[in-house]
């Protein structure tokens, strides 16, 4: 049979939370029809801002069923679909960074801004046991768009931050801020510098590092780091 691995699959929940993952598509070699690669790419990209389900799990289930139904009808054969999120393959270039979705319940948050909204960044009182501690978090919810082609660019963002007194980062607000780049059109380096600058201005940290590891495109992956 034929197996397709789609690495840029995403939709959003009814609360606006992006869900991202790799979609595996399989159909029999007996099929009399074949799918054209550019058309399936455009088809899958059409879900990027489509709301599906109240939670990430519901969104994935609905998206899988929708793709299976649509492709089975188009190819006139049975199509099997699986979706794998980053939870299944936590292999990252940076060690010791906590996944943001394991620190807070993203399903409970509302996401409404998708145009790099630095006003999303909020502070909370520093917990006594965290005074002077370095915060190291990562998220796979970074999506921006190429300023030339407007094609979506997908990445993981890693943040190392040592807070100053009175400026402990609110993790829920950081999640909202990362998601707010979803409809921004800039180069990878510009996005990384924007994130770094906004975090520096919002929290006045003693230490700060931002790395944006973007998915490979055209044989190249760009990984800007600012510190």
Report residues per predicted region.
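N-terminal intrinsically disordered, cationic/polar leader segments
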Residues: 1-227
């Amino acid at each position: 049979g034929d197996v397709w691995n789609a690495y840029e699959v995403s939709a959003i929940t009814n609360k606006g939370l992006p869900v991202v993952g790799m979609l595996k598509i399989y159909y029999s070699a007996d099929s009399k029809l074949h799918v054209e690669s550019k058309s399936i790419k455009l088809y899958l990209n059409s879900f990027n801002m489509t709301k599906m389900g109240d939670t990430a799990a519901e969104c994935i289930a609905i998206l899988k069923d929708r793709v299976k139904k649509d492709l089975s009808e188009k190819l006139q054969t049975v199509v099997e679909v699986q979706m794998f999120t980053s939870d299944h393959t936590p292999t990252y270039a940076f060690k010791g960074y906590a996944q943001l979705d394991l620190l807070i319940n993203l399903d409970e948050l509302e996401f409404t801004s998708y145009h790099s909204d630095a006003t999303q960044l909020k502070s909370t009182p520093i917990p006594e046991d965290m005074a002077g501690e370095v915060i190291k978090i990562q998220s796979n919810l970074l999506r921006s768009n190429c300023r030339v082609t407007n094609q979506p660019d997908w990445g993981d963002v890693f943040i190392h931050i040592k807070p100053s007194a009175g400026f402990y980062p609110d993790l829920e607000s950081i999640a909202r801020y990362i998601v707010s780049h979803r409809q921004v059109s800039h180069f990878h380096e510009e996005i990384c510098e924007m994130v770094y600058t906004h975090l520096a201005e919002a929290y006045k940290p003693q230490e700060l590092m931002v790395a944006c590891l973007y998915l490979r495109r055209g044989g190249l992956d760009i990984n800007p780091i600012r510190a």
